[in-house]
C-alpha cells in the first residue's frame, strides 16, 4: 500500500503536465507529495528517511521552479535525489563498512557479505547513472520527453534493475533442502 501511495504524486504530475504545463504540474506535484506524506504519517505513524528527502526536494525545487518560473529546477530534482540515494549507498559501504541495502533487507534474507556489497555498489551505481541520464534528457531533449522519462523511463529502469538484482540474489538463497536440514 505504501509503495502505491508513492506513485500517486507521479501520476498526478504526469496528468497535469499533459493537460496544462510544467508549472501547473510542478504545483500539483508539490501538493500531492505533501498530501501523500500526511496520509503515510496518519496510516503508519512514521515517515521513512527517503520520504523526508523526497518531500524536502520536491517542495524546495518545486518552489524555486514556480518562483523563478524556470523548469530547470524541477528537472534537477530527479538528479539530486538519485545522487543522494547513490551517495548514501556508497558512503554506507565504503566509509561505514555497513551496506545500507543489507540494513534495509537483511531481515528479509540472509546473504553473504560479499553479495550484499555487490548489490549495494550496483544500486549506488544505478542511481548515479539514472541521475546522469536525467541530466542529459532534461537539458538536451524537449520537456515532454523528459516528463515521459521521469514517469515511465525511470520506472522501467527501476523494474529492470530490481529484476536483475532478484536473479542475482536467487542463486544465494537457501534451497528447501537446506532449510529442512536446519
From Swiss-Prot:
Report the InterPro entries cross-referenced here. Answer: YciB
Where does the record say this protein resides?
Cell inner membrane
- What is the name of the protein in this document? Inner membrane-spanning protein YciB
Transmembrane feature ranges: 22-42, 53-73, 76-96, 121-141, 149-169
Q: Which family does it belong to?
A: Belongs to the YciB family.
Q: Name one GO cellular component term.
A: plasma membrane
Signal peptide from the UniProt entry? none
Instruction: Give the matching NCBIfam families.
Output: ispZ, PRK00259.1-2, PRK00259.1-3
Q: Which residues form a coiled coil?
A: none
Q: Which UniProt keywords are given for this protein, alphabetically ordered? A: Cell inner membrane, Cell membrane, Membrane, Transmembrane, Transmembrane helix
* The keyword Cell inner membrane belongs to this UniProt entry's keyword annotation: yes
The answer, when asked if Cell inner membrane is one of the entry's keywords, is yes
Question: How does the protein associate with the membrane?
Answer: Multi-pass membrane protein
